[in-house]
Amino acid sequence: MPMQQRMEKWFEAWKLLMHDMEKQGAQVWPLTIEPPAAMEEIESREESLGISFPATIRTILLLGSSQVQINWSLPSRTLDPFSLSGDLGWSLDAFEWPYFGGDEESENEKRYLCFHVGGNGDMLLIDLATGVDDPPVYSWGHETDEFLLLGKSFTEFVERVTELGCIGAECWNYEALAGADGLDVEGQVAQEWKEWLQIYRTLTFEEAAQDFEKLVLFAKMHGAGDSRIQEAFTQYDWEPILQKWVTQIEQETASSNLLLWCQLIVETVGKKAESWVRSLWESGPHYQRLGSSQRAYLTAACLPEEEGLQRVLAEMDEVVARKECLVGYAANSHLHHFHSREVILWMEPHVAYPIEGWDELFAVSRPRWEDLIRWLDGNEAQRQIALSAWGKMLTSGESPSGEANWQEINRLLDVAYEKAILRKEKERVDRIRSSLETVKH
């Protein structure tokens, strides 16, 4: 196939890929396909590098595009079994001699020419040592200092990476798909990835709503926070739906995905899962698969509020009884889903520095003005937590409930400012004061 025709095929494939990914809710960055470079520009770059580009690279820059950039990433709710993202590019100005670290110049730093750098510093390189018109492409990992063959030629690399959805450019994207001859587009992993990606690009909600298995797959890819998706699940019995997600939890190997499966249970089964959630509080395989914070999330969502809250508070009390350090982040991860003022009353004797986590928990636990006043008049940690939490509430347009005693609040703000030692503590008070008129009205 003539090179110009081949490049036009690439351009069309990239445009369609980005269109499909954006339509399905993936995060995409503007596709860049710049006009070809002028011969004078190419020769100027060659002169600055001290080499002549291989013939194929010259042709691509001269007849195809002087700069290409393709970037996409899947939404955080997507349960992608491969955890890949898209990053492919080159530009005339990006061709540069690589630096592989170390005090002395490596001979490899004149063997390879970098044409693209991934977000983490990994590089895509062409190998000049072969002396061929269409040089091999390698990925270099900045952490491992290892080279991975991606294609025996530049055009072969672009063909194959395009077929794989322009994955890259951090080297871990390629590792499961690389073979002895570069990216293996026919291997089992590649076939599974291409099939998954094609379904992601084309499966619509309207199609998924007509078939249970497709609906399950759609929810895996997009989550089920959308009310349309939740409504579609109501046409099916809840037991098979719950079993689908429980089975996935049992089979999951990535701990970072466990919360996503729990969210699907909450969104598609909800309180009907209460018996299963209660079983998590018994010694059994489900609890061994899930962490205590994930169990707390399910408990808050699926059990009656009082029952669920008391279970989690009892667990937190056990942590305190064991004299383990209860930090704000841990308390927040277990209790913020309840949005209960009772949490504020529970946490009052337990809070300490650092305040991070505690302040977020206070803010989301529906405080009353009397709670805020009590904490502003409390110990130093309570005061700083209350100020930080109040600031977070003001930022989100919220305020405590009940009647505000502004005279007492202003007095306590004055005290807080006088007792503040760090600049950031004084700044907290200043931000509160600057917002008071808005709150009062």
Task: Give the predicted meaning of each segment.
Residues 1-122, 174-175, 191-202, 206-214, ...:
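A surface-exposed partner-binding patch
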Residues 118, 127-205:
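Long, contiguous interaction/recruitment modules in multidomain scaffold/adaptor proteins
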Residues 164-168, 336, 365:
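Short loop/turn hinge sites at secondary-structure boundaries
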